Amino acid sequence: MTFNGDLLWRHLVIPGVVALMAGTVAAEPPTPRKPIVIDSAVASIDDTANTADFTTISVAQGGARITAETAHATDLGSKNSRWTFTGRVVITADERGSIWADKAIVVYRDGVLDEILATGAPARFERRHTDSARADQGQAEEITYEVKQATVRLRGHPRISTENGLEMNAPMFLYRLRDGRLQAYSDQGTQAVHIITKPTGSLVP
C-alpha cells in the first residue's frame, strides 16, 4: 500500500524503533525508547517496500532534530533503517553541537543511531565546550560522525578553528568528542598539517 500525503503539514510518530541523534557532540549513544516524530509538507509512504519520501521535513527525538528540504527512508519502522536527507540539511542535538550539510546519510543499527555521513561544499560542524559564545568549528567536503566511537572525522580540504584561537588545515582531522582531543593527519611522507595560532597577549614585555 502506498500512502501519499499532500496536506499542508504531515505529522507522523514512529514509536520506540530508532532514536535520533543525541548530538553531533554527544558522548553517549541515544536511547531507542523515545519515538521519532516526523513533520513534513508532503509524505509518500510505501508499506510494501517499507520506504518513504518526504518534502520539507523535520525529524525529532527528544531534544535532537534533523531538518532538510527532502528525505528518503528505507526500512522505515525497523531497527535498522537508513535515511538520506538532501537540501539545506541541519542536524542539531542541543545548544552545543550542530552540523550543516547539502546531504546527509543517517544510519541506524539495532534501534540506535550508528553513523552520520554529511557532505557539502563544504559541510560544517560546530562544537561548544561551555556556555560561552566561542566554539570549535570545522568544515570539509565530508564529515563523518560515528556514535559508538564518539568521533567526528573530516576529509576533503578540511579546516578547523578552535575556541582557543588555533586555525588548522590538514588532509584529515579526527575530533574525539569524549575528551575534546583533536588529531590531524597528513599524507605519508608529507608535512601537510598547517597550524596558525593567534596569541592574545603582547609578545613585547
Q: What do the predicted segments below correspond to?
A:
Residues 1-205:
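Mature-chain termini and adjacent capping regions
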